[in-house]
């Protein structure tokens, strides 16, 4: 059997500077959930109503499912169509961080929740029709043979579908609840923002190589797919937030992020400003520069840097 030749990646010869830029961003952003003291949220968790606790577990289980899809199928499906070996490296990093994100929700569960309640939430995720449907819609394009449609699906997952879930911890954070959990979610959001931007950038680079007719067909496909996902997401939101007064606010957040997903692909917004008007408190909570509550020496937050050790001498202690 003849083996194909393998070329070693050379980071000193880069054909697309964006690959190195994003690699550096992702690696400098690296974090692990163990660095965030989620146990500090136990008192706040106990003040939530049963409905709020159950909703939080369902939201995080749904997000875990999407992260699992992106880790196991999504990012790996983009590898065969990478334009450069450096793009392959970035996609591998993206895949790994999606696994970290999925692991993070389990850290939240093990810290705040009862096992039986978490097990019930996982069982719910297997049976919830809108949740399974959005995963199936995305997955069918990942398993298809059109590399540009894969990228469209990936951007919609990274930049749109997560946000019906992300809304809830940002809402709690804006009211001073589960603030350490919100710190962790902000780290995830920061990663997803880079992922959606980068994959959208690669989509636009590939679009330069095809005909105008093909570009128009793909744009039509993208808007049709977004509307299909949006309709399903409305149903998911109505079911998820049924026992709260928050569904309309979540839907505005969906429109806001759907427009951002389209911008990542190089397209104009779909939803008018009045449909995408998000509560300023939620936008403030989303900021990656929001104040973290955990130890800044951990280096895992987004608004501080890793502490540096300096050797001391005996005279330093002569006060």
Feature locations, PLM:
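Non-heme di-metal
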Residues: 1-319
């Amino acid at each position: 059997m003849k083996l194909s030749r393998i070329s070693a990646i050379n980071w000193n010869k880069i054909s697309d500077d964006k690959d190195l830029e994003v690699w550096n961003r992702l690696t400098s952003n690296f974090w692990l959930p163990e660095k965030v003291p989620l146990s500090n949220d136990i008192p706040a968790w106990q003040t939530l109503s049963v409905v709020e606790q159950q909703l939080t577990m369902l939201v995080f289980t749904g997000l875990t499912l999407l992260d699992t899809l992106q880790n196991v199928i999504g990012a790996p499906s983009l590898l065969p169509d990478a334009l450069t070996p450096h793009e392959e490296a970035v996609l591998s990093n993206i895949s790994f961080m999606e696994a970290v994100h999925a692991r993070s929700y389990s850290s939240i569960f093990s810290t705040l929740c009862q096992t039986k309640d978490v097990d019930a939430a996982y069982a719910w995720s297997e049976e919830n029709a809108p949740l399974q449907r959005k995963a199936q819609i995305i997955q069918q394009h990942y398993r298809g043979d059109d590399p540009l449609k894969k990228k469209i699906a990936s951007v919609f997952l990274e930049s749109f579908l997560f946000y019906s879930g992300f809304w809830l911890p940002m809402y709690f954070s804006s009211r001073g609840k589960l603030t350490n959990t919100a710190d962790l979610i902000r780290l995830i959001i920061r990663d997803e923002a880079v992922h959606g931007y980068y994959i959208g950038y690669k989509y636009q680079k590939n679009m330069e190589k095809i005909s105008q007719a093909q570009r128009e067909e793909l744009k039509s496909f993208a808007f049709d797919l977004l509307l299909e996902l949006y309709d399903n997401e409305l149903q998911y939101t109505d079911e998820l937030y049924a026992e709260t007064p928050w569904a309309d606010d979540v839907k505005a957040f969906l429109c806001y992020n759907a427009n951002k997903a389209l911008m990542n692909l190089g397209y104009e917004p779909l939803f008018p400003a009045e449909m995408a008007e998000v509560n300023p408190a939620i936008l403030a909570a989303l900021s990656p520069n929001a104040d973290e509550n955990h130890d800044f020496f951990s280096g895992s937050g987004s608004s501080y840097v890793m502490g540096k050790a300096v050797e001391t001498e005996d005279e330093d202690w002569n006060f």
